[in-house]
């Protein structure tokens, strides 16, 4: 999941070198924290959060084969 989020985020931003993805696996869920440069926040979130929602939807679909819930947090 980490690699998927990283590829998507790097394709959206102007500063791909600043993209950082941290994956934390717990009993009940997989937590993915996406950090981007402050200038790129708007590009990753999108108008009314549409791009952020799309990223979460793609990750959820990719994780549907597993038994854990995936939570994507953008910072």
Annotate each predicted stretch with a short phrase.
Residues 1-43, 53-75:
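RNA-contacting regions in translation and RNA-metabolism proteins
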């Amino acid at each position: 999941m980490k690699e998927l989020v990283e590829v998507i985020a790097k394709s959206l931003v102007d500063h791909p070198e600043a993209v950082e993805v941290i994956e934390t696996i717990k009993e009940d869920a997989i937590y993915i924290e996406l950090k981007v440069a402050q200038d790129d926040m708007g590009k990753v979130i999108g108008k009314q959060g549409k791009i952020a929602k799309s990223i979460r939807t793609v990750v959820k679909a990719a994780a549907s084969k597993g038994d854990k819930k995936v939570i994507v947090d953008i910072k």
